[in-house]
Design a protein with these regions (language model features):
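Double-stranded RNA-binding/processing signature
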Residues: 1-130
């Protein structure tokens, strides 16, 4: 499958699911959180649209992404959904751009790069959540 031919929201849909698995694995295996209520609370720090949007700002400022990934992000971010242009919509669009990157890389079977981005992401969230 050629991910560049897919709608950016489809890439984001897939990327959201893939990213969620990486974060759940991190919380259970690395952080050793095992109580469902604690897992749910911890997951919010990592999978929220606000966290993803904040990470993307940092990633762009620090050069953590390739030119190709930035182009995928912009494509995913700029895909028009329904609704007014308010702060919540803008954050959601930025989050969709991040998820589109993950979905695109997954379809290209670039799992090492996904892990690298997720590792940057986890460190960024852990540093910024307090």
């Amino acid at each position: 499958m050629r991910p560049e031919l897919l709608n950016a929201l489809t890439l984001a849909y897939l990327g959201d699911a893939i990213f969620e698995v990486y974060i759940r694995e991190y919380l259970v295996i690395e952080k050793q959180i095992v109580k469902p209520n604690d897992l749910q609370k911890a997951a919010v720090d990592y999978v929220s649209a606000y966290a993803q949007a904040g990470f993307m700002k940092a990633a762009m400022e620090n050069g953590w992404l390739t030119d190709e990934e930035i182009a995928i992000y912009k494509r995913g971010r700029n895909t028009k959904g329904h609704g007014a242009k308010n702060k919540k919509t803008i954050v959601h669009n930025q989050s969709s751009g991040f998820e589109a990157i993950i979905g695109h890389l997954y379809l290209e079977e670039r799992h090492d790069r996904i892990k690298e981005i997720v590792n940057f992401y986890k460190k960024w969230v852990d540093f910024n959540k307090n």
